Amino acid sequence: MHKNSHTRPSFLFIFLIIIMALSNPVHAAGLSIKDVLPGKGFAENWVIEEKVQLYDKDTLFDHIDGEAELYFPYGFDAMATASYVNKQNPDLSIVADVYRMASVLDAFGIYSNYRKTNNLWVAIGAEGFVSSSQLMFYQDRYFVRLQVAGATSLEKDIFLACARTISGNLPAGSGQPKELEILKIPALVPKSERYLAQSLLGYVFFRKGIIADAAAQDEKMQIFVIHEDTQAAARKTFDQYHSYLKAEGQGIQMTGNPARMQVIAVDPLYGGVLVEQSGRYVIGAVRVKNTSVAKQLIDELHGRISADAGQ
């Protein structure tokens, strides 16, 4: 009897947890992207016009013909879209698009292609911004884009009501991608980070990476980080860039050791550059005018890599 009195509450607690998880689409396995969009409406007088439409890699061009190619390198998987009309003004509507990408980093990557450092930020998802005509945010591996139709502007509160409803139907996620942490040095210009899923700086040997604006001691430049799987892969990437600079660049200086190689040069496209291979990473600064300031920023990036690796 004593044993059963303890066992039953435990089983009851576990059963209730399972029921709660399955009843919430956010936590249920196999969340359908179709269920992310409100099925009827999101606020008073705002109702869905037609059923939710779904698109995949083969049909995305039908919805965003001029932009579809931008999404594919970020692991685009599926997209759901719906229009919500105002019952008092049927010509006014919001088009809501939800894109499912490969990862939170990829969702950030798409989002970062649209944001600007002077946007009006809103507390939606991991990060979001709103203007008079649109609202965008990303959350977990989803990118959400809301746009007004039938008018040139819409009240911010209407955008926010729609965005919050969609956000509540998405997995909560863990905030911003951890890959951004390395760039968080004092010189970083806030909200300037961009993740490029292919050909960072336009160079095929820089397969993918994160780039951002930096400002220190009255100097402006761009800093970047490329995360390779191994130190050998990072060295190969570094060597490919070094070979390119030897063929096309000027004023090349090479220093360091096998674990931390550094090159200073003039890139034909980006002017002064300082690039370093640091373990599994390639880090660098471009558009450099003051090499000593660039070295300081690279040292700070290297310090964050070392701290992250527990070295």
Regions found by a protein language model. Give the residues of each.
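N-terminal secretory signal peptides that target proteins for export/translocation
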Residues: 1-8
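Short non-domain terminal segments
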Residues: 9-13, 127
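Bacterial N-terminal signal peptides
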Residues: 12-23
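Soluble, non-membrane globular domain cores that form compact, hydrophobic packing
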Residues: 23-311
